[in-house]
A protein has these predicted regions:
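Active-site mouth loops of central-metabolism enzymes
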Residues: 24-36, 100-116
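N-terminal binding-site loop/beta-alpha segment at the start of enzyme catalytic domains
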Residues: 1-92
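Short aromatic-enriched loop/helix-cap "lid" or pocket-rim segments at secondary-structure transitions
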Residues: 93-98
């Protein structure tokens, strides 16, 4: 199987690459990575044909979504599929109010549940 091979996604008119890039690591899960490393990870995935990116507000308290947007902003939007999650809203927070675990040096947000 090739990472760039496209497969139909469910019963909708959408195709995604066989391999996707799960972005929890760029949200600094378990250990911190710098911006250069994050950018390089996105570029490496792109260079290998990956066009499916999965992120979530909870990954690094918003850091993963920021880095995903930063790295993909110059790519043609019709060339990739971006998935995220619902149910958690990010709100600005003071650093001392945040329980980072298991994230390292995460974004400055707290999470609230909202399934409306």
């Amino acid at each position: 199987m090739q990472p760039s091979q496209k497969n139909k996604f469910g019963r909708v008119d959408l195709e995604v690459t066989a391999f996707g890039f799960g972005t929890a690591p760029v949200g600094n899960i378990f250990r911190e990575i710098d911006e250069e490393t994050s950018d390089a990870m996105f570029q490496q995935s792109w260079d290998h044909g990956i066009r499916f990116y999965d992120t979530a507000p909870m990954y690094g308290h918003g850091l993963s979504e920021l880095r995903t947007g930063h790295s993909l902003r110059w790519k043609d939007r019709d060339e990739f599929v971006l998935a995220s999650k619902v149910g958690r809203v990010l709100k600005p927070a003071r650093k001392q109010d945040i329980d980072y675990a298991p994230w390292t040096n995460a974004g400055r947000f707290t999470m609230e549940f909202d399934y409306s």
